[in-house]
């Protein structure tokens, strides 16, 4: 998992692509006060128009140039998808806690989406509910959701993954033990996308 320069959170829900989708981006470099902020990028861009309905999920990468910068977009078009809302609870771990990085992917698109990174500032303790920066992802209804974790107590870093088979509705739970470092419980709430054809 990469540590990007900019961590963008959201969208809170998936975007149903039935009409043109416009992304609006405004990035600023923070100054000491809000009036000292400097514009880095101001962009409104139309999502690549898929003039056909693909039968397989695909990853679309496109660059957009604004007056002051170029932004690289990466968009996953997930076919026949359901929405997965993920939550994480720490069942056990070291007394001083651990640092964690959480990501999700599908088995067809191996591109990981960062759900949360505690860095070296936020320690997770037994009993904690981890507040994910991003908790909603889209998954093919016939595929698998793969949640991966990289956990560290400061001296050792270990990884683990947990797979979930999607449902149209309902809740799935599963536990992940990362060697002797920690045990986590994942809860995934499944739902269909709701959209109007008008």
Task: For each feature predicted by the language model, list its residue ranges.
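Peripheral membrane interaction modules
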Residues: 1-198
